């Protein structure tokens, strides 16, 4: 069975997902990780002439569902030299049961939203209960 391969830009992701979607995905991911139902191997660094590539991978749940790999390049001189962002990258998503590529996603929107979502999840579970309702997160 062949599935359509999706390519989603940063703008596509902005339109398709809301911050609350990221918060719930992060909360679920942390729960699966705590239960040992997903893999999150140690990230890899690949040196380059003027920067570094960072490779982060994971599977959900435990290889039976999806495998993702995020590759971000961090090139501090990009803005001055080329007018490009310091950090650029992509997320590759595949079916873990048969290896079929499913999507290639711009990583910047995901990375930015994930950072905020992790903070929201931490606040949800670590904030003092007498500070008020955290359901807004």
Please tell me what each predicted stretch does.
Residues 1-114, 118-120:
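N-terminal ligand-binding/catalytic initiation module
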Residues 95, 116-137:
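Glycine-rich adenosine-cofactor-binding loop
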């Amino acid at each position: 069975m062949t599935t359509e391969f999706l390519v989603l830009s940063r703008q596509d992701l902005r339109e398709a997902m809301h911050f609350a979607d990221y918060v719930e995905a992060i909360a679920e991911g942390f729960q699966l990780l705590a239960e040992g139902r997903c893999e999150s191997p140690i990230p890899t660094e690949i040196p380059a002439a003027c920067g570094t590539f960072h490779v982060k991978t994971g599977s959900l749940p435990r290889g039976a569902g999806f495998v993702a790999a995020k590759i971000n390049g961090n090139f501090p001189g990009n803005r001055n030299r080329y007018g490009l962002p310091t950090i650029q990258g992509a997320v590759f998503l595949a079916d873990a049961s048969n290896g079929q590529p499913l999507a290639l996603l711009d990583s910047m929107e995901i990375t930015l939203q994930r950072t905020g979502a992790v903070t929201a999840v931490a606040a949800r579970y670590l904030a003092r209960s007498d500070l008020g309702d955290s359901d807004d997160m």
